[in-house]
Amino acid sequence: MIFTQLLNKMQTIKYNYLLYMKKIAFLFLTIRDVNFTKIWDKYFSGNEDKYSIYIHPKFPNEAKWRTDKIISNIKETAWGFITRAYLELFKEAIKDKDNFKFITISESCIPIQSFDNLYKTLASDNRSWIKLMKITKYKHDVILKKNTGNFIHHYARMCLNRHHVKQLLINRDKLEFFHNMQIGDEYFLSVLYPLSNYKDIEITYDDWEYVNEQVKELKNQIKLLYEEQEHNTNTNNKEKINILQDKIKDIAKNPKSITKVIDDLQKIKNSKAFFYRKFTINSDIEDYWEDIINKKLKIKL
């Protein structure tokens, strides 16, 4: 009995020693500020020795939140073109030798598990967390077909370990192709091929299921318009079809945006991810966040 207690105490001391001085680097890519500064401040409160913050705002002069954390080298960004900004964030964060994990965060993200849960989980796992995706025939034919090499399709939000960040920076010359490629942020980890020492898991949840259902419904409408046109030569649905096709292109760019949280609350609570997006600037998430975090505290990791 005494031996068991002593062993447990030694393991606790060893665990605390391993955590000593290790920090998680949060790499914020924003337009101005994160959408919910109060939530992030509460999330970080009391853990100041366990995290580092690096911010790359598109418009740094309009940012007000933690302006001392804004990196000096700001790159031009646009939808689908953010890898240069990512690279600058990684370059800045790797300078701190105490940073052992590097998480990319967008302005519309919020944490849905406590900082303590995240820290303990990452400190006990030396792998990167990268959610992989299948390369569809469309994306292969349109984006990759004319380019040789091995490609990895992955979520744009990830958690990299220090080794993988170093490898990215060593191979920065190979990133030029992805800098000039739309949605290069979903492929730039291809420079790490063959990928090893990673866990295929999403650290941030994006609701693409909702978007996919919307796209499916719009495609069905287009199909019906084509069928109507075929059966009635006097009918011309070209304009209607073009409108729906443009709508699909617009919708398919981003995951579901959440303003009224109540419809998604249970899904958020059930998610095993540590972060969730996209919450619009007008979202009422602040009314629910404490409840979400408290529920997550009961989860045994």
Identify what each model region corresponds to.
Residues 3, 15-20:
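Aromatic (phenylalanine/tyrosine) cluster motif
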Residues 6-9, 17, 244:
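Generic short amphipathic/hydrophobic targeting helices enriched at N-termini
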Residues 20-301:
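ER/Golgi luminal nucleotide-sugar-dependent glycosyltransferases, focusing on the catalytic module
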